[in-house]
């Protein structure tokens, strides 16, 4: 039940009508052919599996991911789209279900459809980390390693997901949420 409330909360925060402002000051509608999926959760969503060479090749350019963190060494800039070559969550993570979700989507959708994903995940974290009401209190009680991962999202993974979703919404349409939550909330 708590998961449903959190997912509903995400949708309510994101479903406000938002057009983008063109340089000429006019409204530009988001591209209805750009489908965006918000992805969050624990270690498997973060990318716990090893990335092999085959995972880095053949990614259709219609499958893109938005960087959720800045990483100068890896060349990542938060809020920018890139072809969805793994890793998705952070530069030091692995293969996620998102990698093949996006590939399957573009393989089975018309060529006019582009798929974008935004992944914000922290292994071992409770769903409380993605609840705006409990995130800060939950994180205070966690070990330093988890705080370090969360710090890459400015200490609030929920807020980062919402921030990036609002950026993405200016270009496309949020079509769904992928949540992979496991051992901490079973």
Write out the residue ranges for each language-model feature.
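Positively charged n-region of N-terminal signal peptides that target proteins for export
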Residues: 1-4
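Bacterial N-terminal signal peptides
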Residues: 7-15
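Sec/Tat signal peptide C-region and signal peptidase I cleavage site
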Residues: 18-21
């Amino acid at each position: 039940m708590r998961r449903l409330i959190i997912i509903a909360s995400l949708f309510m925060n994101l479903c406000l009508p938002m057009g983008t402002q063109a340089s000429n000051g006019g409204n530009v509608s988001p591209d209805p052919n750009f489908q965006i999926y918000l992805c969050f959760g624990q270690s498997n969503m973060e990318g716990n599996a090893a990335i092999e060479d085959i995972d880095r090749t053949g990614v259709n350019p219609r499958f893109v991911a938005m960087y959720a963190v800045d990483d100068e060494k890896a060349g990542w800039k938060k809020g920018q789209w890139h072809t969805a070559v793994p890793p998705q969550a952070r530069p030091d993570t692995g293969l996620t279900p998102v990698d093949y979700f996006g590939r399957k989507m573009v393989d089975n959708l018309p060529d006019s459809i582009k798929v974008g994903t935004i992944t914000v995940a922290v292994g071992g974290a409770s769903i409380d980390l993605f609840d705006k009401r409990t995130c800060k209190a939950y994180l205070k009680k966690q070990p330093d390693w988890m705080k370090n991962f969360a710090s890459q999202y400015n200490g609030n993974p929920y807020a980062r997901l919402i921030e990036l979703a609002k950026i993405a919404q200016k270009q496309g349409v949020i079509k769904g949420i992928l949540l992979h939550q496991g051992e901490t909330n079973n």
